[in-house]
From Swiss-Prot:
Primary residence: cytoplasm
Listed GO biological process terms: DNA repair; protein maturation
Organism encoding this protein: Schizosaccharomyces pombe (strain 972 / ATCC 24843) (Fission yeast)
Keywords noted in UniProt: Cytoplasm, DNA damage, DNA repair, Nucleus, Repeat, Transcription
The keyword Cytoplasm belongs to this UniProt entry's keyword annotation: yes
Protein's name in the database: DNA repair/transcription protein mms19
Classification via InterPro entries: ARM-like, ARM-type_fold, MMS19, MMS19_C, MMS19_N
CC per GO annotation: cytosol; cytosolic [4Fe-4S] assembly targeting complex; nucleus; pericentric heterochromatin
């Protein structure tokens, strides 16, 4: 049996590796079930081991080795393992079977009963019989894997008597390896040896076979797509090996320092990474002797380098060295001598010239040393800062002032790190050494910030950063000084023509997180007084109000500030409604700011919004009901968004209580806790949703109902059960209202209520009810306005069905698709069908809207074939409608599912570029922009149609900025992904055609046109 299997294996191995593996599995099964012994297998292959055909010998050994590798680890007794080991070792002289022999030895080493005392014999045999340079990469890899097993499992069986021979053999065997796959293994094994054993007497040998690979210059060949090893992998492995034993220090560090003085930037970076790793890994004493030499080798890279990465890495290395030095020796004479040497050189450099570059580099070195601890900061400050800070700055050239500000920024960053910010727990016990310079520096920085022309942005930005750091340090500035700084920041942040206003706003926000009480006493009164003055003087526009309020919202991130802001804004709203000269612009700006503020806090997952639930909601509903005649729909929409943000993050019990009160307010003539004033209560008593259908001013309040209900959990009983009465009233609102905002709110609420309903059968029952089926009559026989309203309702209903994968969703979409053939209804049908698949900000998962996995893909797969079928038979205006619909559908589904269909769709999309509908152009351009990268070969077939269309769009000012910009991006991506030979014919036409775009009124378009034009110079 065994001889038959051996013959079958030898026959199969050349034909199919899988067949050969099956034979090995059968042999293993025979041995495990005792139907064959390992001796039988060895006997069966014996005749092949002496065959003159080297291929046959190799196959025979491979069969035995593979079998041993697949056997259970405890299958063979120690006696058999020893015999087989001797068999393999005796064959090491056969170079042609070395690969297979090594595989077998490795399998034996992994056997549970391998006699560990034999490991020395294995090593001796391998060292004496292997000549690594002779072998191919795969053979060397198998040999290295044998050594890997030895080092992983048997290293401690290498005794002190055999250590030297083992080390010598390892150094000889591992030397000169060049293949990156093998090198990774070599580095790994060397690291284990070096980190396990003292290498006394072998430092030079191990260093030579390791450091010879520095620097790593390996780059994977372009065709090596399956090579997983990168240059960075090799660099990391070499680095870890070189620092595995600090016995290398006397050899490695001088070599690295030489590299730092005279090498390319990339090699210097690699050398610094090794040095940093050595400082982190070795005993401090192994490298402290070289501290001065290290500084001399890197100081030019820090003080004069033009490469930021190299400079930052050198500074990091200096900081690591100094930190370890200080931790080991404290303020010893050797440490202070090292620091003094550096500080003296820095002082000399600054005395020679004070400019941005010299100050920045010197300050960075100072920070690397001083930031180690409060004690080191004080020492460095006392020994270095006086010579710098006493330099005259006022009335000096701007370049010199900029340099000093750069220097101060580094210094104060150290102070923030060591002495802590306001509200931080860490505070140094030692007095701040910069307190004696505070008045002078605060005066200088304040003058640079507020006394310099606005257009000197660079120096003012530097001053702003420094003064912010000064204000952040705990107990550094007095209350009056801190107030003064906040006043400076207020002046800048609320001056909308100041180029650094954005940074000033960020500083105010950060200081608000540290000292909110100060902002309440300075920034808030300042901002609200300016708002009040502008309202009184009637000198500001809506845009100005929005800018003021935007800054206030931005700086009110801290909880108490946010609460104060909300209170102030609501009070301002009340005052406006009481005023005889109410500013509609201000009211709209306030409610918009409230909406933005609550959304931003929800996006940041702030936890305090539920605390606004009852009180703020009452005030908002009361204000809106009391002033519904004077509030426009836009204001109500912003209030609705605020209500939604508050309601959706509240817990179940609050939502349950809220929906009950909302029902009382909108559906019953009973008192609701959402209304708080007597006059407003009377108005609310006369109001119901049904009654509002005959009064437009009350009908607008439907917007608030949508905001309140839209964010409710789908687990609420009110949401689980479909409320037919409410849905029918909302459908009537869609037909009655004259406001697009009210209409869209009612439609969104209809979709939300249906989508969240618990039972599919309840939804099916509603769809078959008269209230819905009668809509089809209005689509086909109603007035254009009625048809449009009916289509909108049906589309939003279907949106709810499709997104939750209701069984009637796709059939309803097909019925809507058939309405494109109706006269005077086609445009409305396109818009309605596009709604189904288009994302809506109010109908999202955050509002518990159900969106089943891959629902868009399902819709596309069902509807797109129908659309394409209609396009093939339609003509004239009808075809344009189908093209518009196709573009809208494709533009709102994941691009991955469209790409496979592009060969048939692309010609149709190109026709969409000539349509006047902006949304169609935008969707089409988005798809084309993706296709340029994904389907280059397909697009090249249509360049003569595509390029003229893309050139025409950005020159047409009727197209909005976003469309013109996207068309230019599509044009610009063509030279990046399309073969040059295909574009040469169009080169001159595109370059000339883009000239008008260089004068576009929008800078972003001009910039993109210039960039695109440059790409076409091919």
């Amino acid at each position: 049996m065994s001889s038959n299997l051996v013959a079958l294996y030898l026959f199969s191995i050349d034909r199919s590796q899988d067949e050969a593996n099956d034979v090995v599995d059968r042999i293993v099964e025979e041995i495990v079930t005792d139907r064959m012994g390992i001796v039988d297998l060895v006997t069966s292959i014996g005749e092949y081991l002496t065959d003159n055909n080297i291929s046959v010998r190799a196959k025979a050994v491979l069969l035995l080795s593979q079998t041993l590798g697949e056997l259970p680890k405890d299958r063979l007794p120690a006696k058999h393992v020893s015999v087989l080991l001797q068999f393999y070792l005796s064959r090491l002289d056969d170079e042609v079977t070395m690969k297979e022999n090594a595989l077998g030895i490795g399998a034996l080493l992994n056997m549970q009963n391998f006699p560990a005392q034999k490991i020395v014999d294995v090593c001796k045999a391998l060292f004496s019989s292997t000549d690594m340079p002779k072998y191919a990469q795969a053979t060397r890899l198998n040999i290295l894997k044998v050594f890997e097993t030895i080092i992983d499992n048997y290293l401690f069986f290498i005794s002190s008597q055999t250590r030297d021979a083992f080390f010598s053999g390892i150094c000889s065997t591992f030397a000169g390896e060049k293949d990156p796959r093998n090198l990774m293994l070599v580095f790994s094994m060397l690291k284990k040896i070096l980190s396990t054993f003292p290498i006394d007497g072998f430092e030079q040998q191990f260093f030579d076979i390791t450091y010879c690979y520095f620097p790593i210059t390996f780059r994977a060949p372009p065709d090596a797509t399956n090579l997983a090893i990168t240059s960075d992998d090799l660099k990391i492995a070499l680095r870890e090996t070189l620092v595995a034993n600090d016995a290398f220090s006397k050899l490695l560090l001088p070599a690295l320092f030489e590299r730092l003085k005279a090498s390319t930037v990339r090699i210097k970076i690699d050398a610094l990474n090794i040095y940093i790793e050595a400082c982190k890994t070795w005993r401090v004493g192994a490298y402290l002797w070289s501290a001065k030499d290290f500084w001399e080798s890197i100081k030019q890279e820090i003080l004069n380098s033009t490469d930021a990465e190299l400079q930052n890495l050198a500074l990091g290395a200096l900081n690591t060295l100094a930190s370890k030095f200080y931790k080991e020796e404290g303020f010893s004479s050797s440490f202070t001598e090292f620091v003094d040497m550096i500080l003296i050189q820095l002082s000399q450099r600054l005395l020679e010239d004070v400019n941005v570059k010299s100050c920045g580099s010197c300050a960075a070195v100072f920070a690397s040393l001083a930031s180690i601890s409060v004690e080191t900061f004080n020492y460095c400050s006392c020994n270095f800062l006086p010579s710098v800070l006493d330099l005259p700055m006022v009335n000096e050239p701007l370049e010199k002032q900029k340099g000093m500000l750069v220097f101060l920024e580094y210094v104060y960053k150290c102070l923030v790190l060591l002495y802590g910010k306001w509200r931080s727990k860490n505070q140094a016990d030692i007095d701040n050494p910069l307190l004696v310079y505070k008045d002078k520096q605060l005066s200088f920085v304040s003058g640079s910030l507020m006394g310099t022309a606005k257009d000197e942005t660079e120096i003012r930005m530097l001053a702003l950063k420094v003064i912010f750091l000064m204000a952040s340090i705990k107990n550094f500035l007095t209350e009056s000084e801190l107030t003064m700084v906040l006043q400076f920041l207020d002046d800048i942040a609320f001056d909308f023509s100041d180029p650094i206003k954005k940074k000033a706003t960020e500083c105010l926000k950060d200081l608000g997180l540290l000292k909110p009480d100060f902002l309440l006493l300075t920034s808030f009164p300042f901002a609200f007084s300016k708002l009040t003055d502008d309202v009184t003087a009637k000198s500001s526009s809506e845009e100005t109000f929005k800018q003021y309020l935007s800054v206030l919202v931005s700086i009110s991130e801290e909880r108490s500030l946010f609460k104060a802001l909300v209170i102030r804004l609501v009070e301002m709203l009340k005052d406006q409604f009481k005023s005889k000269e109410m500013s509609v612009d201000l009211v709209e700006s306030i409610v918009q700011s409230l909406s933005v503020a609550f959304k931003e806090r929800n996006d940041r997952n702030e936890q305090e919004i539920p605390f606004f639930f009852e009180e703020l909601l009452k005030q908002l509903f009361t204000l809106c009901f009391a002033n519904c005649e004077s509030m426009n729909v836009r204001c109500l929409i912003y209030v609705s968004q605020t209500i939604n943000e508050i309601v959706r993050v509240n817990h179940f019990e609050f939502q349950e209580k809220f929906v009950g009160q909302l029902w009382k307010l909108y559906m019953e003539n009973s008192n609701s806790d959402l209304i708080e004033t007597e006059g407003c209560e009377k108005a609310a008593e006369r109001f119901t949703l049904a009654a509002s259908l005959s009064d437009q001013k009350f009908l607008n309040l439907v917007v608030l109902l949508q905001g309140g209900l839209n964010g409710l959990s789908k687990k609420l009983h009110f949401i689980e059960k479909l409320n037919i009465e409410l849905l029918n009233l909302l459908i009537n609102v869609v037909f009655v209202t004259e406001s697009p905002g009210v209409k869209i709110s009612a439609l969104r609420l209809i979709s939300s209520l249906i989508n969240k309903c618990e039972k599919d059968e309840d939804i099916s029952s509603f769809i078959s009810s008269k209230g819905v089926t009668s809509l089809w009559d209005k689509v086909y026989t109603g007035t254009p306005k009625e048809s449009e309203a009916a289509l909108d309702v049906l589309a939003w209903v279907d949106k709810a069905l499709v997104s939750r994968k209701h069984s009637e969703g796709i059939p309803l979409a097909f019925k809507l698709l058939d309405t494109l053939n109706l006269q005077n209804v086609g445009d409305s049908s396109v818009k309605a069908l596009s709604i189904i698949i288009k994302d809506d900000p109010a109908l999202s998962k955050e509002n518990s809207y159900v969106e089943k996995l891959l629902y868009k893909q399902r819709f596309y797969a069902s509807v797109s074939p129908k659309i394409l079928e209609h396009i093939s038979t339609a003509t004239g205006g009808e075809k344009s409608l189908y093209l518009m619909l196709l573009s809208n559908v494709i533009g709102n589904v994941p691009k991955e599912i469209v790409i496979p269909d592009m060969p048939s769709i692309l010609p149709l999309l190109l026709q969409c570029l000539s349509l006047s509908d902006i949304s169609v152009k935008l969707s089409t351009l988005n798809v084309i922009h993706t296709s340029v990268k994904e389907l280059t070969s397909l697009l090249t077939e249509y360049l003569d149609t595509l390029i003229p269309s893309l050139l025409a769009i950005p020159k047409d000012m009727n197209n909005p900025t976003v469309v013109r910009l996207l068309a230019l991006k599509c044009l610009g991506s063509l030279p990046e992904f399309t073969p040059t030979t295909n574009l040469q014919l169009f080169r001159d036409k595109v370059i000339r055609g883009l000239i008008p775009c260089l004068d576009d009124p929008k800078r972003v378009v001009r910039t993109e046109a210039s960039r695109t034009r440059h790409k076409w110079y091919i």
